[in-house]
Amino acid sequence: METILQHVPVGQKVGIAFSGGLDTSAALRWMKNKGALPYAYTANLGQPDEEDYDAIPRKALEYGAEKARLIDCRPQLANEGIAAIQAGAFHISTGGITYFNTTPLGRAVTGTMLVAAMKEDDVHIWGDGSTFKGNDIERFYRYGLLTNPALKIYKPWLDQTFIDELGGRAEMSAFMTKEGFGYKMSAEKAYSTDSNMLGATHEAKDLEHLNSGIRIVNPIMGVAFWKPEVEVKAEEVSITFDEGRPVAVNGREIADPVEMFLELNRIGGRHGLGMSDQIENRIIEAKSRGIYEAPGMALLHIAYERLVTGIHNEDTIEQYRINGLRLGRLLYQGRWFDPQAIMLRETAQRWVARAVTGTVTLELRRGNDYSILNTESPNLTYAPERLSMEKVEDAPFSPADRIGQLTMRNLDLMDTRDKLAIYSKAGLLSLGTSSALPQLGGDKK
């Protein structure tokens, strides 16, 4: 059974993820002219660079859509963002600076909620603007078919007729003008931007070249902190969690997760917190480069991990981080709702996040420069008196206890020395004076 349609489905309803930009506008009008019945669906993801959401469906109707709907995806996106924080679902980082998978989270929400809306309108063919070289074509494919197993995929950008007739932005603009809409192309930027409430992605064009970097980017969620003329004042902020969920900022309770992210974005954005420059592996294993913004996610991540390290033991923290790396890859690959991802996510939410209650106070400066000023929690297992260098009453252990503990280490030390001797005899340990490995003789003493 054919899932991907390579030609316009004439006379059939076709749902298109409609952004209002030139690409989707031209595609919608072109499909209409070819005999399809286009239905337009726009996701409100709280994009910081979108000024008027209500105008987008009106545009779609003007261009020939049979029906146009605006779907509010913000509450779901906010909750998925919090779930990613709770599970540490981030696998891409450079020099300790994290990419918070904000685009994959947005695709998980868009791909499921738009297709669900299409089902309500008896629309079972879906198209979007993703290209064959990127990650989104696979993410949307997976999420769409998970939501509607009967779904067919039609993407104008995979239709050779569309490519031949409207292969570039100049051709699309001329087509829309010819159709009587006078569409004017926006000024070309040196890169492309995709955003949602959780973060922004800047990539392609000039940013494909590694000798071009963050200095050409105009942030849309914060300030260009690298510019000396941009004033950034130090600021204290406190974030409170209750059983793994953020509930207050600077002592003010915020019950709505959407408002929580908007407030954290405002605070973090004033400093340029959460911006990063990453080289990553796309799903098809080719490398790409992106510059990212995520001020609110960065604030939550810093505060949440501070509480995790103060509350949980070393083995739990290690497993949380291992699972988070794996879950981050699954999220990136469009598998956020696959069973293996749900298992990892719910494990973290149940056994890690549930204990994360407390308040972390930070001082934010420029960019990702910050200090942790205070950590408070009723669940802290950090107890300074246990290891105090001062004399304390009711010490948890004595010098004699430590002597006994160290004596027990002799067992594994003997085993280790025996193994090193075996490696030495096998020639695996060099005996040069500069060797960093233990220098053992060949004979056991």
UniProtKB/Swiss-Prot annotation:
Its EC number is 6.3.4.5. The keyword ATP-binding applies. It holds the Pfam family Arginosuc_syn_C. InterPro entries: Arg_succ_synth_type2_subfam, Arginosuc_syn_C, Arginosuc_syn_N, Arginosuc_synth, Arginosuc_synth_CS, Arginosuc_synth_type_1_subfam, AS_cat/multimer_dom_body, AS_multimer_C_tail. Signal peptide: none annotated. Keywords: Amino-acid biosynthesis, Arginine biosynthesis, ATP-binding, Cytoplasm, Ligase, Nucleotide-binding. GO terms for cellular component: cytoplasm. It catalyses: L-citrulline + L-aspartate + ATP = 2-(N(omega)-L-arginino)succinate + AMP + diphosphate + H(+). This is Argininosuccinate synthase.
